[in-house]
Amino acid sequence: MATFDDVKAVVVEQLSIDADAVKMESKIIEDLGADSLDVVELIMALEEKFEVEIPDSDAEKLIKIEDVVNYIDNLKK
């Protein structure tokens, strides 16, 4: 769950939300209140944090926090 904790920290910072709101099943837009600009900034922050590149075609598929965690875990393999 280390990746989740790191993703959660980035999400909390970028969206200025309470850490308790961020769960694996949380939808980034619907549940956490992100708009399209927030999502772009979140992806950029995740890329910087994890030193990865997330193409737009992949970023649009990252709906839930769980999707982000799994995607990053797969990149790190």
Curated annotation (Swiss-Prot):
Keywords: Cytoplasm, Fatty acid biosynthesis, Fatty acid metabolism, Lipid biosynthesis, Lipid metabolism, Phosphopantetheine, Phosphoprotein. 4'-phosphopantetheine is transferred from CoA to a specific serine of apo-ACP by AcpS. This modification is essential for activity because fatty acids are bound in thioester linkage to the sulfhydryl of the prosthetic group. PROSITE patterns: CARRIER, PHOSPHOPANTETHEINE. It comes from the Bacteria. Transmembrane segments: none annotated. Pathway: Lipid metabolism; fatty acid biosynthesis. It is found in: Cytoplasm. InterPro entries: ACP (IPR003231), ACP-like_sf (IPR036736), PP-bd_ACP (IPR009081), Ppantetheine_attach_site (IPR006162). SUPFAM superfamilies: ACP-like (SSF47336). One of its GO terms (molecular function) is acyl binding. This is Acyl carrier protein. NCBIfam families: acyl_carrier, PRK00982.1-2, PRK00982.1-4. Residues 1-76 form the Carrier domain. It holds the Pfam family PP-binding. One of its GO terms (cellular component) is membrane. Its main location: cytoplasm. Belongs to the acyl carrier protein (ACP) family. One of its GO terms (biological process) is lipid A biosynthetic process. Carrier of the growing fatty acid chain in fatty acid biosynthesis. The modification O-(pantetheine 4'-phosphoryl)serine is found at residue 36.
